[in-house]
Regions:
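Non-catalytic C-terminal accessory region of glycerolipid acyltransferases
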Residues: 2-118
Length: 118
């Protein structure tokens, strides 16, 4: 359980990387976050809820393809203290950054994958 692990290690410097999905699996808790790529979209809020409870910083990881098999990664701050905002605001900002990245480099997006299965 990530929450109990995070609480146990809250005084240690750690980085947690949480995946997210536009089609959360059944039973994970689906929360509407508005439009993403012109589609009504839901998101999993568990990990961002942990960040809010523990006052974590939240970053977006932007990946830029430099050449075949080589990428540059840049952390873009979404918020420095998640307890000062809401999970919905954090996820909205995340999806805004993701959509911006997709529009900048559409060739890196897997267009054949159905991302809205609900």
């Amino acid at each position: 359980n990530i929450l109990s692990y995070s609480i146990k290690h809250r005084n240690e410097r750690r980085m947690y990387i949480y995946p997210t999905d536009q089609a959360p699996y059944w039973g994970s808790g689906r929360f509407p976050i508005g439009k993403f790529m012109n589609q009504e979209t839901t998101a999993m809020m568990g990990s961002v809820g942990v960040a809010c409870k523990l006052s974590h910083s939240v970053m977006y990881l932007k990946m830029k393809r430099v050449e075949r098999g080589r990428y540059e990664m840049t952390f873009i701050p979404i918020c420095m203290d998640a307890s000062k905002t809401t999970p919905e605001e954090i996820m909205r900002k995340y999806y805004d950054l993701l959509e911006e990245e997709i529009r900048e480099t559409p060739e890196n997006w897997l267009w054949s994958h159905n991302r809205w299965k609900w």
